[in-house]
């Protein structure tokens, strides 16, 4: 997805960032094949951010991202978060992701945490 946005508008976490203690990372496998992944980043005791949601091209439109996101929503509730937010791209390639998030109750919002307005970004949030 980095190829769709200029460097200053790319907010994906690298491997070192995924290892930080405020990040929980999940992956979905079918035997030895990676189907998808996603992360939850704690922003504070009540607010977390969905990060690094990806689905393998081979497994697109099979419900992998939805199942993973539903798991992350349940985990966020279990941890006591009252709000989840996310940043995704504004380009057409991100429309399926935006539909998925909207279908699970996320609504568009302004920038949160350290984000700023960006024509390449769409911000969404959900009260839990």
Spans of model-derived segments:
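Acetyl-CoA-dependent GNAT
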Residues: 1-47, 51, 56, 69-70, ...
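Terminal substrate-recognition subdomain of acyl/acetyltransferases
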Residues: 88, 113-114, 118-128
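Conserved acetyl-CoA-binding loop-helix of GNAT-fold acetyltransferases
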Residues: 55, 61-78, 99-103
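Conserved GNAT acetyl-CoA-binding A-motif
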Residues: 76-89
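Conserved active-site alpha-helix within GNAT-family acetyltransferase domains
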Residues: 66, 91-110, 117-119
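Residue-level recognition of the GNAT/N-acetyltransferase active site
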Residues: 56, 89-91
